[in-house]
C-alpha cells in the first residue's frame, strides 16, 4: 500500500482473510499539517499487521522510528531513483529546444520550476526569489511547468510584481525532459518533500538543483550538484505566504553561484545519479526486500491476522467508515471549490446545480444582464 487511506483501512480485513501473506507499505514523507503526520501516522497505526515499511529517504525512516515508534528492523530506505536513459541530455538538442521555448530570448539562462502549483510547493516564494534575483541580473527566464489550485493566483501576483514577462507558464507537460534540457538550474522551494522526483530527473540531465532543506533532499543534493537552503518557515504555517528576506536571499545567492559556474556542475550531477540513484539500483534493492519478506513472513503479524479473523465485522466496519468519511470530505471539497469558482455553494441534493451554474455564467455576460433587465421592466 502507498498513499491510500482506503488501502490502509482495508489492510486489517486483508490480513484477517490471508494472514500468511506479508504486507508492505511505502511512505513518501510525513506531513504534520495533515492529521499530524499524514501517511506516516497511518503506517504506524497499522504496524501490527505490516511486515515491512519502505521509505524514500533516511529522514523519513528516522521519523517513523523515533517519533512514531516503528520497529527499526521493519523500516528500510529505498531511494526512488530515475531512469537515467530517458533523462539524458545527450538525447536532446539544447539549441533547437531553446529556440522552441524561448524564441528571440534563446540566449538567456533558464531556471526551471517543475511541480504541482500548490501550497506545499510555495510558488509565491518563487516569485519573491525571481523579483529579488532580477534586481541584480536580467539574463534569465523562468519556466513554470505544472498546474494546481494556486496557478491563477501565481500569475496574478507575477503581474502585480512586474515579473510576469520573465516567466513562461507551460501548464502540465508529459515530456519534462525537454525543459531540463534547456535549463541551467532547477528550483525546489517546497515547505515539505520526501525526496522530489524532479531533483533526480534534473541531476540525471546534468542540471544542478537549488532546494529547500526538507525531507531527504540533502541525501541527494550536496554542494557538488547544487545548493541546499535552510527552511525558515514552520511547516504548520504552510498557508502563510510571508517569507523571510533571509530565506529569499539565500535562494538568490545559491542560484547566482550556480549560474556563474554552470559547467562545473553539469558532469558531477550526472555522475552522482549514475553512481547511486539509477532506477535499476532501486529495482534491485526493492526486489531483494520483496523476495526476503515473502520467503520469511513475520510470525507475529501472522498471528495478529488470525486474531483479526475472529473480529471480521470490525474490519469491515473500518472500511465502511473510511468510505463514508471520504464521501464527507469529497462533499466539503466540492462546496469549497464552488465557493471559490462561482462565489456560492450549490447543494448536491435537491437542486439542479448545472442549471444554476449556467445561470451564473450567463449573468457574467453584459448583454445577458441587459436583456434580463429589459424583461423585468416589461413585466413590471
Where do the model's predicted regions map?
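Short hydrophobic beta-strand element within catalytic cores of glycosyltransferases
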Residues: 208-211, 221, 228
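Nucleotide-activated donor-binding/catalytic signature segment of Leloir-type glycosyltransferases, i.e.
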Residues: 155-171
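A short, well-ordered alpha-helix in the C-terminal region of glycosyltransferases
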Residues: 257, 263-276
